[in-house]
Amino acid sequence: MVVVLLAALTFYLIHVARSEELKARWRYVVSSGASLCSLSLLCFFLLLSVVDSVHFRPVIDVQDGRAIYDVKAYSLLDKALGKASSAEEKSYSMPLATQTFEKISRFEDGKPVRDYEPLKAGGAHLKARADWAEDVIIKSASGLGAGLALSALLWFLTVGLISRSKGRSFKEEVRTLFKRRDEVPYEAILTTCSVLIVLGCLIGALWPYYHVMGTDQTGNDVLYQAFKSVRTALVIGTLATLTTLPFAVVLGICAGFFKGWVDDLIQYLYTTLSSIPSVLLIAASVLMIQVFIDSHPGMYATGIERADLRLFMLSIIIGLTGWATLARLLRAETLKISQLDYIQAARAFGLGPFKIMKRHVLPNVIHIILIVAVLD
């Protein structure tokens, strides 16, 4: 699904490149430093989602010339994170800790003792617990140093390429960059990328030896779970919104424009949907999907394929049942717009209702659609 969204984004960029009007609008967007910072972060999360969407099953053995694959499927993100993706503890632990958060009971010399248990992947390389502070400081300093060096290299190369493309000297380009005289504030992108690089190097220096953000109740690494949740959040948010918009826009505008029995019918429909408890509906739908998966075990061989199907159907269900709020807002705005003079003039000139809704109503409710879509 993430790959499909990425392909759709690519086609949209090609469409923007061919349209002067869209290019002018996007030039206005990228002239803001805050917009470019947000765009850089979105690209980073999209990259994480794409890397986490490429799944494969490694070959564990070869018998009679046939490859035997592992039952468990992995993603490129799992392989990139390496040890962090497989390290599991028993329960909670603090960030960068070397022992569990809670004491456990064990026997020493035949006597019961309650003490903290050492973590499997948290400071296991340390010879003594007293070396923890020094080790963390050294690894953090090395990570920060590497991050700052890479950030400086990024700034140097980027400024050099920009100055060469514009025919200016390096010093002049640096002066222009810091005085913010360019139409596109490249310093916003470079600053955001530098922060990500420094944080990445810092985490990369500590993560092979510690749980950077600790572990949860079941002993899983919290930072690893956060990285893995990016793809889920992107798929659910984007797919549910894309599923919601057609129903909400069409039905909401039609209810406000036609009024009468059309309005009553659409109101009855979304009032009925709103009365159904969403949690129970989602739970029932997931159970139905699970029954389908159990009835067709050959179609989904691995656990990750079954999880992806459940995630996809869950997003569709949320989208199909979550359009009522936006439809109400669009209905109310359309009721107001339909009484304005330019709508009456369009009717007087013989323009059909659907053309009026497309040309005159929809452009005036786009702001509501954008706000609700972003908040959802």
Language-model regions, residue ranges each:
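Alpha-helical transmembrane segments of integral membrane proteins
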Residues: 34, 158-159, 189-199, 215-376
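Gly/Trp-centered helix-boundary motif
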Residues: 1-244
